[in-house]
Amino acid sequence: MDIEKIEDLKKFVASCEENPSILLKPELSFFKDFIESFGGKIKKDKMGYEKMKSEDSTEEKSDEEEEDEEEEEEEEEDDDPEKLELIKEEAVECPPLAPIIEGELSEEQIEEICKLKEEAVDLVENKKYEEALEKYNKIISFGNPSAMIYTKRASILLNLKRPKACIRDCTEALNLNVDSANAYKIRAKAYRYLGKWEFAHADMEQGQKIDYDENLWDMQKLIQEKYKKIYEKRRYKINKEEEKQRLKREKELKKKLAAKKKAEKMYKENNKRENYDSDSSDSSYSEPDFSGDFPGGMPGGMPGMPGGMGGMGGMPGMPGGFPGMPGGMPGGMPGGMGGMPGMPGGMPGGMGGMPGMPGGMPDLNSPEMKELFNNPQFFQMMQNMMSNPDLINKYASDPKYKNIFENLKNSDLGGMMGEKPKP
């Protein structure tokens, strides 16, 4: 074997001797089981155990550890010197109960019973309990015994350390007389020797309530102390279980709240992502490209209407405004739409008819046209002038719209209205 390992083992054993509570750690349970398998017993060092307990306070105890602690507490209670007086239930059969008979006892039987009672009392005084028991068994065999007879035999059975039979006779006595104080007290003694402190406490309290006996005070005090310990221990277990359940419910509630919060967060993130995607798709819109549409105007134009349509009178001319549109549309594009002859006379001071479109429709892809269409003020201005022609002079003299008018004159629309576009 490795000498260094042996030295380490010696040091470990020495530390265990100084503080045996080390062996109570879960990781050393195998070593603790090994020691106990050879009959060894590990006792807690209170200071060391409390210190170790405080160090591991953040760790939760398992159910097995709690059960081990409870078993150790019970073992410590078993070492109580007061419990050395406890006796075990007897294995022998209980003495027979009285037979069921009809009618009343004869005078001879009554005389015999009285004689047996006197003999039994003398035997009890001389502590000849076995012989006294035989006398009471014979008395009960006649039938119809009183509650007192059963109580007397129960007292003898208790002296013979037969608590089970004693309890049975006391119960029979109470069935005959529920107010028999002696039956309660004797049965309380039997329960006390069996270590059934709760039953002993109930019977002793009831017996002393009916007929108080100061000679039983010491036993009554012992029973009360034991009962109090049992009650407190049971109350402690109940409170501990309730606290355990409460912590469990709180833990489950925290999990549910955390899951709910996480779900809400994911829901908000998904909505935010969907809104972002929607905004991105809307911002991807672009203006239509007119490239390739009607290059150089519509070739050939529309065939003219025979005779042409009478020209519409122009809009009333404004001083400094656009020149009047002369007569109707001329032939326009070759083979195109016939000019619309102007209305004779037109409106006084009005604008002449719209001249024909030389070369067809205006080129929508020209720089001037694109600049006009990209200017929102142009559409607003045109809409306002169509609803109120008097605004033409206002827009023409407004420096804000000067550039629009320049582009309009240079565009094909300006040519349509009599302006010559700049080359």
Swiss-Prot record:
Coiled coil (residue ranges): none
Cellular localisation: Cytoplasm
Main location as per UniProt: cytoplasm
Gene Ontology biological process terms, A to Z: chaperone cofactor-dependent protein refolding
Chain segments carrying region 19 X 3-4 AA approximate repeats: 292-362
TPR repeats: 113-146, 147-180, 181-214
Cytoplasm keyword on record: yes
Residue ranges, compositional bias (Basic and acidic residues): 46-60, 264-276
Residues covered by region (Disordered): 46-82, 260-301
Gene Ontology molecular function, alphabetical: Hsp70 protein binding; protein dimerization activity
Classification via InterPro entries: Hip_N (IPR034649), STI1_HS-bd (IPR006636), TPR-like_helical_dom_sf (IPR011990), TPR_rpt (IPR019734)
Residue span, STI1 domain: 361-423
Keywords in alphabetical order: Chaperone, Cytoplasm, Repeat, TPR repeat
CDD domains registered for this protein in UniProt: Hip_N
One GO CC term, this protein: cytoplasm
Protein purpose: May play a role in protein folding or protein-protein interactions. May act as a co-chaperone.
The protein's name in its UniProt record: 58 kDa phosphoprotein
Species of origin: Plasmodium berghei
